Amino acid sequence: MNIAKHRKERVICMKKGVFAAVKKDGSVYYRASITFRCKHISLGSFTSEAEAHGAYQSADKLLSATVPITPEDYQETQFPLLPFSKWISLLNFKNNGIYIKTPIYLRKKYFQYYLSSEETLLFDVDDLFFYSNHAIMKRGGHLFVAEYGMQTNIRSRYGIRAYARKDIDFTFVNGNENDYRYSNLNVLNPYHGVTIVHDNGHTEYIAKLHLNGNYLIGRFPSLIEAAIAYNKAVDFACMHGCTKQFPQNYIDSLSSKEYLAYYKKITLPDRLLSYRFS
């Protein structure tokens, strides 16, 4: 069969909002789209013309509705074949006048990001540009975005380290673990190589460096001292031939003079000083 001819014939009889496209292997699939407020919006790709047209009909039903609709009104049976993420984008465009390709719904002073019809994340408007251009994925309870060819945990945007422990290194102030508004995030330990330990009403800060296993650098009375001790251990390792790339702690609250005073006071353990890096 002549694919170009087949495609032309199919386009002629396409239902409203649907057009056919041809894959590299020659198979035909169907795209749905709709125009609203002078904006042409793709609704997705489908295996059949009927499915694509069904998505168009659901989108048209939503956008032409005369009664108020909110995200809480969503029912899959009322809008079949239209992906929920696209339904949210269209509803936000209809109600708030802004089309966003990711499943975001704008509220006053914050926005909701819909992972599904049943799971929502909350963010401050300061993060709107970023999440408008980065889709959030969930895997194993962790939330990621694709950034510079890598998957980045969204918590890193808020100073929460990859292995941070909830209620020890950070807390959600109101208890809602899906609320990433800045006022709800309390980062207790933003530093690499530092562990906070609470024992019988006493708190200590343990600095460690991971070489072939964890090397204890020391136990300190303050978070900042432990963070600087870790930095000093990293400097020592790098100066003695260690090729591993360690992240450094940046401590904005100290002047260079104050930082140096702490740095000089810290003594590295003999076990680390005698370690053979090569």
Regions from the PLM with identified roles:
Residues N2-S278:
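Boundary-flanking segments of nucleic-acid-binding domains in nuclear regulatory proteins
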